[in-house]
């Protein structure tokens, strides 16, 4: 009985000590990792919740939206030094400060959602390690002619080993309206499995055709690393770009300083008719709402 009484007293003393611990002492133990602090917010110990994690992942997957400033897209480090070529080099050919407000000279009906899809697609692929832009001129060539620094190919990758197309935007041979007139076409072609390039060229009919000839020659020279079938390619263009596609499709790259290559299997001109043809011209298709065949008849 004495032993049981002693045990009962010891147990009571233990309950008194632990239940009446000084709060300051409890905090000291908590700081040493022995106890959780009484005023600690449990949510802070659990890390970001599912909603926060989802929002962060979404921002990484699609960093741009219609409210994004155009300058922020141009200067995004993922794009390196070529982000500026997503938009007209001479900024007076465009207006608006955000992707929602973007307007290009001589164009209308620009779809902000498509603009966002284009820049997000390129950003995602570049961020994943893909090359989405290729220089077509060497640094030495750009030093001799600085305007060649404002050229290049944006690459919308298709299925491995697929055929390719080069899309050429219009702009009256004064600027390149790629965001409206070549990027959307290249993106949709890539969704169909084709490799598609959007050319950024120097203004002027002659220099534009020289840049297109150089671009085609570049693609042929790097076909193996690009995993591209060069057997039958197509040229696309709107307005001034349609003329480029027609001229290169008719006369071939060599006529404009490029390599001696085939003229391609087809060229597609949107908005502009072509009046000059050769026996070896590629298949030619006019696209658009107006019936250009009546003017060509």
Regions found by a protein language model. Give the residues of each.
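Short amphipathic alpha-helix adjacent to the substrate-entry channel of hydrolases
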Residues: 179-197
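Short beta-strand/loop motif that positions the catalytic acidic residue
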Residues: 285-287
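Primarily recognizes the serine-hydrolase "nucleophile elbow" in alpha/beta-hydrolase
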Residues: 210, 214-281
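C-terminal motif of bacterial Sec signal peptides marking the signal peptidase cleavage site
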Residues: 16-19
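N-terminal cap/lid segment of alpha/beta-hydrolase-fold proteins
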Residues: 81-82, 86-160, 209, 251
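Short beta-strand element of the alpha/beta-hydrolase
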Residues: 162-171
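Short beta-strand-to-loop junctions in surface cap/lid or active-site-entrance loops
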Residues: 151-162, 217, 226, 277
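Conserved alpha/beta-hydrolase "acid-adjacent" motif
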Residues: 292-297
